[in-house]
Amino acid sequence: MRIGLLGGSFNPAHAGHLMLARRALRALRLDQVWLMVSPGNPLKPSKGMAPFRVRLASAERIADGRRIVATDIESRLGQRFTVKTVGLLKQRFPHVRFVWLMGADGLAQLSHWKRWRRLAAMVPIAVLPRPGSVSPALRGAAASVLRHQRRPSRESPVLAERKGNAWTFLSAPQNDISATALRESGQFRPDSDQE
């Protein structure tokens, strides 16, 4: 089984996340994408962050529950750091081929993550475009350090077969919807269940 892990705050989950998940399913020939809702991103301020259950519910609304699955597994594992979560998932599911999915904005910030080089060695990474983030991401510290591990996008269908030390940039239409814009417009109220 091949599973893409799309971690994030999902404050809220939106059509852009769904578009990225669908693109990853096709390009990487994945069986599933897990929308892993973070219990608390150490790099994001807690001010304005909706309660975990509200963010999980927003991810569940965009997931189909079959190929795109919203999950609280990071919370259940008691983790907040991706490198620890991925390590535990690989132990619990030794026959699953995981791929870490991230937007270009995530790649631009990757060098600030805890043990990010270890993460890149543990699991292949697929990066998807985000408006305004592609160029800074590809010129950033992580992309520079990992430049020799970058695989051409034509190899994306077999990326999941690698154990790590490989990443690719997938082309995809860019959707400029953002969780920040949804919160600022009042379409998502962090203090409510939105039901």
UniProtKB/Swiss-Prot annotation:
Its EC number is 2.7.7.18. Belongs to the NadD family. This is Probable nicotinate-nucleotide adenylyltransferase. It comes from Gluconobacter oxydans (strain 621H). It holds the Pfam family CTP_transf_like. The keyword Nucleotide-binding applies. The gene is nadD. The lineage of its organism: Bacteria, Pseudomonadati, Pseudomonadota, Alphaproteobacteria, Acetobacterales. GO terms for molecular function: ATP binding; nicotinate-nucleotide adenylyltransferase activity. Catalyzes the reversible adenylation of nicotinate mononucleotide (NaMN) to nicotinic acid adenine dinucleotide (NaAD). It catalyses: nicotinate beta-D-ribonucleotide + ATP + H(+) = deamido-NAD(+) + diphosphate. Pathway: Cofactor biosynthesis; NAD(+) biosynthesis; deamido-NAD(+) from nicotinate D-ribonucleotide: step 1/1. The keyword Phosphoprotein does not apply. One of its GO terms (biological process) is NAD biosynthetic process. InterPro entries: Cyt_trans-like, NadD/NMNAT, Rossmann-like_a/b/a_fold. CDD domains: NMNAT. Keywords: ATP-binding, NAD, Nucleotide-binding, Nucleotidyltransferase, Pyridine nucleotide biosynthesis, Transferase.
